[in-house]
UniProtKB/Swiss-Prot annotation:
UniProt gene name: gxcH
Provenance organism: Dictyostelium discoideum (Social amoeba)
Pfam hit, one: RhoGEF
UniProt note: domains: The PH-like region is similar to the PH domain but is not detected by Pfam and PROSITE prediction tools. It is unclear whether it is a real PH domain.
UniProt protein name: RhoGEF domain-containing protein gxcH
UniProt region (Disordered), positions on chain: 30-76, 90-201, 318-410, 835-928
Region feature (PH-like): 699-807
Length: 928
């Protein structure tokens, strides 16, 4: 059968001599380029050169006979243009270089199968300007860029197979083929297949060679591209990928002058000839002016389908994207290819031809790949790691217009006369979900706001207001200090004025700054009380006392003795509010010190206030109320010494005032000591609920005692007495702690227990027993007894009984012997005259019983038949003579409600004989 080269779509009747002469020239020129790669250290270049020669010899194939299966998968085309994301209409893939022509009528020789490495790796450089252009893998181009070292675990031959292949030789002269030349050369020939062959511009490059776009495709012909690996590489190497494409689908130069070419962003500028007229040289006209009708449709390969699906999943939009150049923005609107992406974008462009640039963040949507493809892509990445690092290009695009117009950041595809720039998103943040979009939080205005400067400005405004107010001491009138008494009074008034001024400084600056810090969340609300406690309350107490002291000044001018002690007597209850401040002063200082160490912003603000506040820090102002309260008794003592001895009445009042103020101070100090002691007891007991149960308790006494258990054994422990509770704490081991807590209001009686233990006493109670331990919380018991053995038995019994009585009196549950005091509860004066004491008082219960008996008898008389009265009237029966208080035998009301009181007329119930011992145990009780 007659053979013909179907890749070119040329018949056998063509002028073959012309093509054969051109091919011979190309072969001769290719031999002259053998020295291009001699300096390359890769031994694989020699193998590749031999392989290329064998491939050129086997370019012909029999008509309608498919090529044999290649040994390795062919390299797919590097880029495709998509028409608005449509699947049916796909723009042609235009080859970047004219093929070498070899037409024979012989059968194909054995050898390596042809693939498209020659066409893909062809650099497309201008042949007119330079006959020996630099190759990308030649020493001239890769100067000071050695190949990566050979790994230890890999042999030298295996490793060099991974190196990039050398580019084929570029012919120095190729005859131009345009439409006119093709028509003239082909009109004279007669072809059995086609009388008017297509121009060379319609020739298409496939994985099996070059063929005509107008020819029908054989059923055995396959355009299946190999699978791509999911390996993500950095910015593509110009030796791997061709450069960007123009709007017509043909390759364009990336090294032209004028405008912002994508190649200007590259880190290197290789020396190569001008390529502006390359498309015109090959096709006979400018590729940018090539219309869509002149480009024949291309059969869609599998690789093209992958790109189409990928573009569809990335949601291609029809709106344009703004770029730095106005011309580029207009072309991008025409292209209408945008992708939703993350806000920050990288604009990258390669210096090679024929493909888009795939960056790190590009996604592989195929989902599966073969091991061979993985190894192939890994090899490419290893060999080109140096070039990838040097050839990375970034372009930081302004996204303000995108944010204002679309509120979305899209992938940017920009076309210019120099090429196409594709902007892909940056490297995504690693997430658990693959391909997840991570939203980057922008710093809010609250975080950028300078709070310290705002607070400082407010403090300066506060300072200006405070400076306009004069001090209190400067406003005081003249005080006569001719006598010692007047000098002491003057000192009291002046020191009180200074004390008030210092407290106002603390409130107007330190407390003001702390409240401002709470607004900006530098401090919390609870921190204010932890630092200042009830400082404002103490300030208002002094603010109330100061005008009272000023009223004493007119009397000093008359050399009279003012009753200044009455000011302190009148405000004695107010001074007790100092107790809560003094008791919390130590904890406030510790908390303030912790804030200054941990919170740097608060420390800087407080430090800024020291020059404004008379060079005193916050610690020195917070201790002034404690110092002032302790100074009041000392000033009153000096005042009593200054009084003359003849004025006995004023001496008595001043002494009473001094003792009262001293008692207030001692109570406050005692409260502080009491709080310290309670904290020590809580730490010593160390059970769960003990801190809650001892809250606001006053410590009275403690001692080492023994407790009698249920089985008769004894256990040692400590007995604590408080104003409302009794606590017995025992410690069995280091971690086994137990405490028994009994409320004084629930204790029925305290009695001796010497019939069994000579030094023992029992505490009986008829209510719930509160027991707390490290393992259990609370327990209940209907009736119980706590048997205590102590050498100081009488002392403990008296203390407990006195505390029980005082607690019941304060609680209003104490039961008096007679109830005639109830009528005087609401009276201010409870004194009785002699006549009242001599009058006869009848118990209220007895009167009530008598009234009930009279009512019953009256009801019986009304129901009864009238008969002569045999008995005396009821009124005569119950008439009682008046008795003196000395002769009255009224039974007192017992404090125990479960015991009945005998009536007056009834005989007293005989009590059973008591055993030999004095006290008996209740019938139902249990020991702890």
């Amino acid at each position: 059968m007659e053979n013909i080269n179907i890749e070119y779509g040329i018949d056998s009747n063509l002028n073959l001599d012309k093509f054969q002469d051109n091919e011979m020239e190309i072969k001769n020129l290719s031999k002259s380029f053998d020295n291009n790669n001699n300096n390359n250290s890769n031994t694989n270049n020699i193998k590749n050169n031999n392989r290329e020669r064998s491939r050129r010899k086997s370019l012909s194939m029999p008509l309608l006979e498919p090529l044999p299966k290649p040994k390795r998968p062919p390299v797919p085309p590097r880029a495709f243009l998509m028409n608005d994301g449509a699947d049916e209409k796909i723009t042609n893939y235009i080859p970047t270089t004219p093929p070498s022509i070899n037409i024979t009528f012989e059968k194909k020789e054995d050898g390596d199968n042809y693939d498209d490495n020659y066409d893909d790796n062809y650099s497309g450089e201008d042949i007119k300007t330079s006959t020996t252009p630099p190759q990308f893998n030649s020493p001239e181009f890769n100067k000071n860029k050695p190949l990566p070292p050979i790994p230890i675990d890999q042999e030298k031959e295996d490793y060099h197979t991974m190196a990039p292949k050398p580019l084929p030789r570029v012919p120095s002269k190729i005859e131009t083929f345009n439409d006119q030349n093709n028509n003239e050369g082909l009109q004279n020939s007669t072809s059995p297949l086609s009388s008017s062959p297509p121009p060379l511009g319609n020739l298409l490059n496939t994985s099996n060679g070059w063929r005509s776009a107008n020819k029908p495709i054989d059923s055995s012909f396959s355009n299946i591209a190999p699978k791509r690996s999911t390996t993500l590489f950095d910015v593509t190497n110009p030796t791997i990928f061709p450069s960007s494409l123009n709007s017509s689908g043909s390759c364009c130069s990336s090294s032209g002058s004028g405008g912002k070419s994508p190649s200007n962003f590259l880190n290197f500028e290789p020396s190569k000839p001008n390529f502006e007229n390359f498309d015109d040289y090959v096709f006979g006209n400018d590729s940018s002016e090539l219309s869509q009708s002149q480009i024949s449709p291309v059969v869609r390969t599998r690789r093209q389908r992958v790109f189409t699906r990928k573009a569809a999943t990335m949601k291609l939009l029809d709106n344009g994207v703004d770029t730095d150049d106005e011309n580029e923005s207009e072309l991008s609107k025409k292209s209408g290819t945008t992708l939703d992406s993350e806000p920050n974008l990288k604009s990258v462009s390669s210096s090679n031809r024929g493909s888009f640039v795939i960056s790190k963040s590009s996604y592989n949507l195929r989902g599966s790949c073969s091991d061979e493809d993985d190894q192939e892509n890994q090899t490419t990445n290893k060999n080109n790691s140096n070039n990838n690092n040097n050839n990375t290009t970034t372009n930081n695009n302004n996204n303000n217009n995108n944010n204002n117009n679309n509120n979305k950041d899209t992938l940017k595809v920009t076309e210019t006369k120099h090429g196409r720039t594709v902007s892909l998103p940056e490297e995504p943040v690693s997430t658990l979900i693959p391909n997840a979009t991570v939203s980057k939080k922008r710093p809010s205005l609250f975080n950028k706001f300078d709070f310290k400067s705002v607070i400082f400005e407010k403090i300066e405004e506060q300072q200006q207001k405070f400076e306009s107010i004069p001090s209190r001491r400067s406003q005081l009138p003249y005080i006569n200090d001719s006598t010692i008494f007047n000098k002491v009074v003057k000192e009291i008034i002046e020191t009180e004025a200074d004390y008030l001024d210092h407290m106002e400084i603390t409130i107007n600056f330190y407390l003001f700054a702390a409240l401002e810090m709470v607004k900006y969340k530098i401090l919390e609300k609870r921190d204010i009380f932890s630092i200042f406690s009830n400082f404002e309350e103490v300030y208002h107490i002094s603010l109330k006392i100061y005008p009272m002291l000023l009223n004493c000044i007119p009397l000093l001018e008359k050399n009279q003795y003012p009753n200044i002690e009455e000011v302190f007597l009148f405000n004695s209850k107010s001074f007790q509010r100092y107790g809560s401040y003094l008791s919390s002063h130590d904890s406030c200082n510790k908390f303030l010190q912790e804030i200054l160490l941990t919170n740097q912003t608060a420390a800087q603000i407080f430090q800024k206030l020291i020059p404004i506040c008379k060079l005193n820090n916050l610690h020195s102002f917070l201790i002034k109320p404690c110092q002032r309260l302790c100074k009041y008794p000392l000033l009153l003592k000096e005042l009593s010494k200054a009084l003359p001895k003849e004025d006995e009445q004023n001496h008595k009042t001043i002494k009473r005032t001094t003792s009262l103020m001293g008692k207030i101070v001692s109570d406050i100090n005692g409260k502080m000591k009491n709080d310290t002691k309670i904290q020590e007891i809580i730490k010593e007991i160390g059970t769960k609920d003990i801190e809650y149960l001892l809250h606001h308790q006053t410590f009275i006494g403690e001692g080492k005692v023994k407790k009698v258990n249920k089985n008769g054994s004894t256990s040692e422990g400590t007995l604590y007495l408080f104003n409302q509770r009794i606590v017995f704490a025992e410690k069995n081991s280091l971690f086994n702690k137990k405490a028994t807590v009994i409320s004084l209001s629930n204790i029925s009686r305290v009695c001796d227990y010497d019939y069994r233990y000579p030094s023992g006493f029992a505490i009986y109670h008829n209510s719930k027993k509160v027991s707390t331990s490290s393992s259990s919380n609370l327990g209940t018991l209907s009736l119980g007894a706590l048997i205590i053995i102590s050498d100081e038995k009488l002392k403990w019994m008296n203390k407990i009984e006195d505390q029980i009585v005082s607690e019941r009196v304060l609680a209003g549950t104490y039961t008096y012997v007679t109830n005639h005091f109830e009528s005087f509860k609401n009276l201010e004066n409870c004194s009785f005259s002699q006549s009242d004491s001599q009058s006869d008082f009848v118990d209220h219960d007895i009167q009530q019983e008598q009234q009930e008996q009279q009512q019953q008898q009256q009801e019986e008389e009304q129901t009864r038949v009238k008969i002569p009265q045999i008995v005396e009237p009821l009124s005569q029966q119950h008439d009682q003579p008046k008795l003196d208080h000395q002769q009255s035998s009224i039974q007192p009301k017992l404090s125990f409600p479960h015991l009945k009181q005998p009536k007056q007329d009834e005989k007293p119930i005989k009590k059973p004989k008591s055993p030999k011992h004095k006290n008996t145990e209740p019938e139902n009780f249990s020991f702890y």
